[in-house]
A protein has these predicted regions:
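Positively charged n-region of N-terminal signal peptides that target proteins for export
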Residues: 1-4
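N-terminal signal peptide c-region/cleavage motif recognized by signal peptidases
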Residues: 13-15
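Non-cytosolic coordination micro-motifs
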Residues: 18-51, 86-185
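Surface-exposed, low-hydrophobicity interaction/linker segments
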Residues: 47-63
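Mid-chain, structured segments of secreted extracytoplasmic proteins
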Residues: 60-102
Length: 185
């Protein structure tokens, strides 16, 4: 009877924990695929028609998490040419290490927080993506970031870099070759 209780508990709780497996999202899917899965999201286009970010709160994807962790954390899906290339969790305020510790536990990262350092960066390679954890202790807050970056879309990251380099920072318009030549002379 005791084994049935353990089995039943695992069966009931497994979907809740599985829902928080953000690393199971397939890279390369379109922004519309992600938007269709979300009840609420907002869209930001740093480079319209080329680079798009879909933002929501972490609680929407992982409702079973502790409220402070889930509500105070922004979940961003990054798309280049409408292909998912990065998933990012950002907790920009607070005085805890909830996201950093959640990332270590969820992704089975053994490296621990170095208390004496104001900033710590951990990077772990997986089969098709890299997991990056960042914590930065600032005077009034603790900034935390987890990024899952596709290693299958390096060509798109290169295109994004080239596109960003070709944009005039003052006008946010794309430079043409003639403007580049005039600036060099």
């Amino acid at each position: 009877m005791r084994y049935w209780l353990v089995f039943l508990t695992i069966l009931i709780t497994s979907p809740v924990f599985a829902a928080c497996k953000i690393d199971q999202q397939q890279f390369g899917v379109s922004s519309q695929t992600i938007k269709n899965k979300l009840e609420f999201s907002t869209t930001f286009e740093p480079i319209p028609g080329f680079h798009e970010e879909v933002l929501t709160i972490f609680e929407q994807v992982c409702p079973s998490l502790e409220k402070t962790l889930a509500r105070d954390t922004t979940l961003k899906y990054h798309f280049i040419q409408d292909q998912l290339v990065m998933i990012e969790l950002v907790k920009a305020d607070g005085n805890d290490l909830l996201i950093f510790e959640w990332g270590r536990e969820n992704f089975d990262i053994q490296e621990k927080r170095k208390i004496n350092e104001e900033q710590q960066f951990i990077q772990v390679e997986q089969s098709d993506h890299i997991i990056q954890l960042l914590v930065r202790v600032l005077p009034d807050t603790v900034f935390q970031n987890i990024a899952l970056v596709s290693t299958q879309h390096n060509d798109l990251f290169e295109l994004l870099y080239e596109k960003e380099e070709s944009i005039d920072e003052d006008t946010l318009e794309e430079l043409d070759d003639e403007d580049d030549i005039e600036e060099e002379n």
